[in-house]
Amino acid sequence: MTSGQQPATIRLFQITDFHLRTSPVDTLNGVVTDLSFRNVLKSLNPLEIKASDHILLTGDLAQDPDPITYQRLKSYLKHLTCPVYCLPGNHDDPETMNKALIDADIRYESQIELGTWTLICLDSTIRKSPKGRLSLAQLDLLESNLLSAKGDHIMIALHHHPIPCGSEWMDTMTVQNSDEFFHVLNSSSKVRAIVCGHIHQAFDRQQDNIRIIGTPSTCFQFTPKSSDFSIDTIPPGYRVLELMADGNIRTEVVRLNELPEGLDIGSSGY
């Protein structure tokens, strides 16, 4: 493989929903979210991240979207030797995120070419709302990027889940105009998968021949198939995706060995 050439299989690490606070010792549902996130980052070390790998941060990077929060996140990521891409979640402030976090090493780009794959990143946030929606501008951007994608295969990344995950309370906060979203997606025969955050749980389904993948949070997890807010008794984690040259995807969720210290299992929300 020559310098600058992508490997046949692209390895992508999806890390999501950190919910970092203004102070690194502040908690959310009993969890010091900074510490839990840093523990997840440390767990990546045995996998020997290479310069040819990629890391994707799919929103809710901050619970308190202040410049100091994003600047501290940048300091946590500075040791990584591979490209890092990010997009906002409903708890983020996209403008503050752009100013305080984005630089040459941490990028917020709508279209990323990865060998035979193209990654398209979207902003599904609605200001001051937990629900998701793709604005007309985002739908237009998606349509344009689908047309200009150089890869044979396309993966879409956004924060909100575009189809129900099976938890009644969480499914009030999907992409509200998912019909419009899938209408645009179905204009291309290249779309293979959608990856999202937001749901704080592992998820893997098919719709319209597109694989839809959700990933655990780095802090607390939500109980699958719950009618009301419920915290699960399962450790934090992240997802490894191997994007094959033929359009197939191999993926697994990797979790820490223990629950975060202080986790409030009985919490009724945040």
Spans of model-derived segments:
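N-terminal active-site segment of His-dependent metallophosphoesterases
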Residues: 1-72, 165
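Extended active-site neighborhood of metal-dependent phosphoesterases/phosphodiesterases
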Residues: 3-4, 66-153, 174-190, 216, ...
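Active-site-proximal beta-strand elements of phosphoester/diester hydrolases
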Residues: 9-22, 116-126, 155-157, 210-216, ...
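Active-site glycine-centered loops adjacent to acidic/histidine catalytic or metal-binding residues
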Residues: 17, 59-60, 89, 159, ...
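Active-site environment of divalent metal-dependent phosphoester hydrolases
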Residues: 21-24, 63-68, 90-97, 127-130, ...
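Short glycine-enriched, charge-decorated loop/helix-capping segments at active-site entrances
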Residues: 26-32, 128, 167-174, 227-229
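His/acidic metal-ligating clusters that form di-metal
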Residues: 40-54, 132-211, 247-250, 259, ...
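Acidic, His/Gly-rich catalytic cores of divalent-metal-dependent hydrolytic chemistry
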Residues: 210, 214-270
